[in-house]
Amino acid sequence: MKKILFCLFYYQFLISLLKPLYRLQVWRRSHKRDNYQQEVAQRFGKQYPSPPIAMDEDHKGVIWCHAVSLGETNTVAPLLDMLMANGYQIWLTNTTQTGFARGASRFVDEIAQGRMSHSYVPVDSPAVIETFLAHVQPIAALFVETELWANILTKLAQHQIPSVLVNGRLSSSSFKSYQKIAAVSTSMMKNLALIIAQDSDSAKRFRQLGADSAQIRVAGSLKWVINTPKANSNTINIDDQDADTAE
């Protein structure tokens, strides 16, 4: 436990040192684009859009969903449709500009109606994450496929906000990279309430990184539903994950 805490402290220290370099990277990549100031402000917790609006008295709260890029956004879109149809509001974040553009176009109506808010993901800095969570006030967080951040998951756990990895995929090369920061990886696994893996190989690798078997479900890939019509069934309930993880 002490080793994990020390590694997390060291990780946080490195992140604080790297923030100026990351800001420079964002500037180099984006400064010629019209939304450069918006991207920087959102990544560093300076300015966010308004939270989603509850459309009726039966609203269930805001779910934060993070999808890295275009592919992950396409994959998770039908699930977000179902959650909104069941009374949840969504805050969608992306890492890449292509992912952000896809999110904005795929959910243009939902964003205009106020049922969804959309921004770039905050940098993995404790202070920035605190600002983001205070603004969004999510009841749960969904992360799509692979991209996980230690400080984000730690802060969510501290605020007792369950984190769920959906469509979880961990290739052999990614697994080796996570093994290089084993203590930090173990911390991230322990801070996830539920891991919904694409396949048994990924599930095994998540366990080897420190996830408990009770945390993991193997459910196949979400990608088969990319082209299905928008759903409005009553089969999705985020509260079910608490019961699942207690089995």
Task: Go through the PLM ranges and name each one.
Residues S16-L17, A140:
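Hydrophobic alpha-helical transmembrane segments of integral membrane proteins
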Residues R23, W27-P49, I53-T228:
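Active-site and donor-binding regions of nucleotide-sugar-utilizing enzymes
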Residues V218, K223-E247:
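Acidic, glycine-rich loop-and-beta core segments that form the ion-binding/anion-interacting portion
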